[in-house]
Structures are given as C-alpha cells and as structure tokens.
A protein has these predicted regions:
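Sec-dependent bacterial lipoprotein signal peptides
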Residues: 1-14
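Intrinsically disordered, low-complexity terminal tails/loops enriched in metal-binding residues
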Residues: 15-276
C-alpha cells in the first residue's frame, strides 16, 4: 500500500456531484496550523505530498440552498495554474468540501478547461457557514499535491453537533450500515480503518468499484486542519470488508466518511474517532 503524507495549511478565510449531510457529507498565504494528508494506494510508502493554496475564483454571493458554480485553479511548482493533470482513481481532480463542524461532506470531480486550467464544479451548499475545500491532484510525472482554501457561505448556519467517538460500533449510513473499527489509532502512526458493510444486518455481496477502488475514505480533524484521503487495501478478508490505512498526524477528534458503491449509487458511512 502506498501512503503519501504531507503537511497541509488551511488558507486564510475568504468570503462539487455528490453531497452528504450527516445523519445516516488571488493566491493567499497559508496561515498557521500544519495538517496532514495521507493518500493510500499501492507502492512507494512514505513519499511526501506537496502543498498548495487553492485559488477560488467564486467568492461572492454564495448562499445556502442556491446552486453555485465554483471556479478555481490549483498551482504548479512555479505558481502558475496547472493545465494538464494525471488521472488518479478515474479523475483528474478530487474536490472535497466539508463544513466547519464536520456535519456536511461532498466529494466532487470538477471539469477542467485545458486552455486556462480553470476547474469548475456545480454545488448547492445545504447550510451557511465556513467550508474547508481540499483539491487532490497530480501533474503528469509530478507528485501528489493537495491545495486548500476556506470559503464563507451566507444563509442559515446552524451549529454542528459536538463530536463524540462512536467506533468501534455498528453505524448507519445512506441506505447501508457498517461495523466500523479503527485499529492502532495513535498520533503519528498508521491505523487500520475497517468497514464491514451490511444490509439488514447481513453482509452485502454486491459492492462495486468506485473511482477505481472498492471504496474511498476521507478523514478530517475537528479543526479542519488535518486531512486524510485514503484508498483501500484490496486484499479484503471478505467481499463486504474494506480496510484502509490512514495516518493521523496529531491527537484529537477526527470525523471520517467511508464511500462505497452499490446498485450504481455511492453510499456514505460517517464515523468519529478520538486519537490519543
């Protein structure tokens, strides 16, 4: 399994399609607060991922409940917009959007304008408030990079519920449930995040590949500064078991979203873990 880890910086506050509301998700200088990015896959363990600041063009007029077309660019090593992207897990860019408080999650795959490098994704913010944006990408022959930003969305912004650890446990998701466990959770060490996907209490037998893998995992710390995007170990013990390797950079609460495909639909199972 390849694990690439990078320190991330949340961009200064500035004022996508599948979404999940939990229940069942001009270049600025980075501010303080390093975070982490884990990207699981195949070989070359331990490579460092590059850091960048996402340049969000759509800044004004964003409001909860109103469809928006988000436009942004991500930089190359020289600071210019990337125009050519390598395909990773069936997409050129993975665009993750999470509300502060971690009660809203979206994983989008934006369109790319090869002439300008401008990326665009349509999204309707379900709630107002501050959103953390993460764009995972790689130039051909380059290294994995994560660009970040924050954006403020107008409209009703109800406070998110506080985070409480709920693993190990049987957790409800969107039209699916899973027994979720996190083994070896310790700051600075790789843990194993295991999902046993169930339907009606019975193991499912029909999981489908989603974006080139049997699942995707995104995990973010309570403050939004630590970020993990991992892909599974394909050597599963059973057809309904999906296991991810994920390194948690620092102690504290983290919320995760496991994504699995059944019947042509992507299902999301959220969980919360406290890392010592």
């Amino acid at each position: 399994m390849r694990i690439t880890i990078a320190a991330l910086f949340a961009a200064a506050l500035v004022g996508c399609g599948q979404k999940h509301n939990d229940h069942a998700t001009k270049g600025e200088k980075p501010h303080d607060g390093a975070g982490g990015h884990t990207h699981g896959g195949d070989e070359h363990a331990g490579h460092k991922a590059a850091l960048a600041v996402l340049d969000l063009k759509t800044r004004d007029g964003l409001k909860a409940g109103v469809a928006a077309k988000l436009r942004f660019t991500v930089p190359d090593a020289g600071g210019k917009p990337v125009r050519a992207f390598a395909v990773a897990h069936d997409a050129k860019v993975h665009f993750i959007l999470i509300r502060q408080g971690l009660d809203t999650f979206a994983h989008l795959h934006p369109d790319v304008d090869p002439a300008t490098g401008v990326l665009s994704a349509e999204y309707t913010f379900p709630k107002g408030g501050v959103y953390h944006l993460f764009a995972d990408y790689q130039e051909p022959g380059g290294m994995p990079t994560t660009a970040t930003a924050r954006v403020e969305v107008g409209g009703d912004a109800p406070p998110a519920a506080g985070l409480k650890a709920d693993v190990p446990g049987l957790l409800a998701g969107e039209m699916v449930a899973a027994k979720v466990s996190v083994e070896g959770a310790k700051a600075g060490s790789e843990a194993k995040v295991r999902f046993e996907v169930l339907d009606g209490g019975k193991p499912v037998t029909d999981l489908e590949p989603y974006m080139g893998a049997m699942g995707h995992l995104v995990v973010v710390s309570a403050d939004g500064k630590q970020y993990v995007h991992a892909h599974p170990d394909e050597k599963a013990a059973a057809k309904n078991v999906v296991t991810f390797g994920a390194a948690f950079p620092s102690p504290g609460f983290y919320k995760g979203w496991g994504q699995f495909k059944r019947g042509g639909q992507v299902r999301v199972v959220p969980f919360v873990v406290q890392v010592p």
